[in-house]
Every structure is written in structure tokens, then in C-alpha cells.
């Protein structure tokens, strides 16, 4: 019997989930879909007779839906999460888990109290280049410092939309990948940050962020995050006493050099990260086991983002990151 999943969100990113749920997951079916602009008709990728709801509450209440996947704006993640908790259904939520650490902590607390499964779709963790980097960067010794660069083209369909009050921008939207990657790759928590933004949320959504992070053991990272007109960049470079290593997850390339002069290069077998994320979610449900990226993981990344925004408000001051995901 197949696992029946309800998908909330059918935009550009949500359509990728639709495709995988329809075609790439044996034993899984798309039981229902919720889209905000229901008047636009059925998504072109939806080739089967799947019921479409305009209200996410109706989808979650649908008895044919056994688990929920959410690909919407983070501003409504908390209410969707709580509705899933009330219905007793496991839930996968696209990054960022929430707009603020306070909301994320509330979501995690509700899910844990109910004994339900919450997975955060930090999809970069499944990227082949990132996984190779995680495996091989210890060859360079204790990391002295590392840099991450993520520049993504501005969305062509959002220029006419008015931003929400105090809406966060690039740092939270896709920079959250990097904030999470530091902990994922090092196995350490980020304990302090410094951040500069091109504009604060009270003025408008940020489109550029320069962030300095420090982990528990003192490793230092510099993050360059920006919306650009053209030319995507997605790379990281690590420097240690025994060499350096770099990864490019846009061009799928990992290489390095050790202190003995030996060049290093690895063959990257690209993976479809959304598909890998869905498989992990399904496996966690079917085996009643913790997901590889928990709600607490997603919460922690949002808490680091909180500290970054606070630092920017303070003119780039060093700000400590809260440690307790259950802290109010």
C-alpha cells in the first residue's frame, strides 16, 4: 500500500516536488495538492486526477492524506505545522523552517510534545559535491578558515510584489543553506556571528549579506550571499595546515591540493537533492526513525539567521547564537 502525501505549494519550487512525487518514488502517491491561486487551474506537471484545495486546512484534514509536504513562504509555516500537529500527521517543511527562531522553536516544541515527525528540507545536505567535501576536507587538517559564496539571480516574477513588513530577504531565503552547511560539514554549532546587510528588514528585504561565523572549536567562516542580475555562483573553499580544498555545487566539482603538492580531484555524481530529501522523509516515516534533518536542525539554522539580523541591526557587532532550541 502506498504512502499518500499531500503537497502544500505548487509554485516554481513546488512543481519540482510534484514531479518527483508523481514519477520517482515507488510506493508513494500524491494524494492531494493545495495551491493559493487555484483559479489558474491545474499545474501543467500534474497529469493525474489529484484533488486540489485552496485552503491548506482542507488538505491536511483530508483522510486520504497520511503525510504533509510544505513548499510555501516561511511566514505561514508555523500555522501549517500546528495544523498538521492537530491532525497527527508527519510533516516535511522546505527551508527555512520559519521566519524567526521564536516561531521555529514553537514549531519544534509542538511537534515533539505530540511525538510526531518533523523534517526540514535543507536540501543542500544531499548535494553530491557537499557530501564529498564533508568526507574529504579533514585531509587538510584543522580548518583555519573557510569561505562560502552563494549568488543567485533575482526572481523575475517578484519585481511587482510589495514586500511584507519587516520581511527578511536573501540571507534567510537561500543563505540559510550556508548557515546550515557550516554545522553539517563541521559537526559543530555556530556560536557567534557578525553580519552586514545592504538594508535592514525594516527598510526592505536584504539582497546582500556578508557574514562571519565562528564555531564551537573556533573555526572561522566568511559567507558572501547576494541576489545578482546574472551569473549564479555556488562554491566554498577551505584552508588548513595540510592543504586546501574547494567545492562548487553549481558546476558539481570538488578539488584540492595537499602540502606535498599532490593535486586532488574527485568525480562528482550529481544527485537530485529534492528527490533525495523526499526519499529520506518517506524512509523516516516507514521505519519510524528520526529524519536525517530534524526540526531542531532547521530551527538551529534559523536561530543563526536571527543572530545575523541582530548583528546587522547593531552595525555589525559580534552576537552570540542562542543554544537552547526550546528557549522562548
Locations of the language-model features?
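N-terminal Rossmann-like dinucleotide-binding module
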Residues: 1-47
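Contiguous beta-strand/loop segments that form the cofactor/metal-binding neighborhood of enzyme cores
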Residues: 179-252, 278-289, 320, 327-328
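Hydrophobic residues in well-ordered beta-strands that form the structural core
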Residues: 54, 93, 118-120, 247
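Rossmann-fold dehydrogenase core element
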Residues: 106-123, 141-146
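Beta-loop-alpha module in the N-terminal Rossmann-like domain of NAD(P)-dependent dehydrogenases
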Residues: 17, 48-110
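Predominantly a Rossmann-like dinucleotide-binding segment in NAD(P)-dependent oxidoreductases
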Residues: 124-202, 315
Amino acid at each position: 500500500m502506498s504512502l499518500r502525501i499531500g503537497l502544500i505549494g505548487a509554485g516554481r519550487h513546488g512543481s519540482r516536488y510534484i514531479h518527483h512525487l508523481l514519477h520517482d518514488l515507488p510506493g508513494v502517491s500524491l494524494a492531494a495538492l493545495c495551491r493559493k491561486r487555484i483559479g489558474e487551474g491545474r499545474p501543467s506537471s500534474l497529469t493525474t486526477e489529484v484533488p486540489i484545495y485552496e485552503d491548506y486546512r482542507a488538505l491536511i484534514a483530508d483522510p486520504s492524506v497520511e503525510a504533509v509536504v510544505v513548499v510555501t513562504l516561511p511566514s505561514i509555516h508555523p500555522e501549517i505545522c500546528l495544523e498538521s500537529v492537530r491532525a497527527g500527521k508527519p510533516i516535511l517543511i522546505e527551508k527555512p523552517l520559519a521566519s524567526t527562531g521564536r516561531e521555529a522553536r514553537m514549531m519544534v516544541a509542538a511537534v515533539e510534545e505530540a511525538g510526531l515527525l518533523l523534517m526540514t528540507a535543507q536540501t543542500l545536505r544531499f548535494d553530491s559535491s557537499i557530501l564529498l567535501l564533508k568526507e574529504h576536507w579533514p585531509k587538510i587538517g584543522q580548518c583555519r578558515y573557510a569561505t562560502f559564496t552563494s549568488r543567485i539571480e533575482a526572481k523575475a516574477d517578484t519585481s511587482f510584489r510589495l514586500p511584507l513588513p519587516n520581511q527578511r530577504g536573501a540571507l534567510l531565503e537561500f543563505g540559510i543553506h550556508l548557515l546550515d552547511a557550516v554545522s553539517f560539514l563541521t559537526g559543530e554549532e555556530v556560536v557567534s556571528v557578525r553580519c552586514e546587510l545592504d538594508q535592514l528588514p525594516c527598510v526592505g528585504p536584504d539582497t546582500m549579506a556578508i557574514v562571519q561565523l565562528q564555531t564551537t572549536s573556533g573555526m572561522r567562516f566568511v559567507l558572501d550571499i547576494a541576489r545578482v542580475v546574472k551569473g549564479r555562483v555556488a562554491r566554498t573553499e577551505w584552508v588548513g595546515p595540510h592543504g586546501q580544498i574547494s567545492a562548487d555545487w553549481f558546476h558539481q566539482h570538488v578539488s584540492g591540493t595537499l602540502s606535498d603538492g599532490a593535486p586532488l580531484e574527485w568525480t562528482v555524481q550529481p544527485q537530485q537533492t529534492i528527490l533525495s530529501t523526499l526519499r529520506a522523509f518517506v524512509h523516516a516515516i516507514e521505519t519510524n526513525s528520526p529524519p536525517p534533518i530534524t526540526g531542531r536542525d532547521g530551527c538551529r539554522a534559523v536561530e543563526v539567521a536571527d543572530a545575523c539580523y541582530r548583528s546587522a541591526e547593531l552595525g555589525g557587532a559580534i552576537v552570540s547564537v542562542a543554544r537552547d532550541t526550546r528557549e522562548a
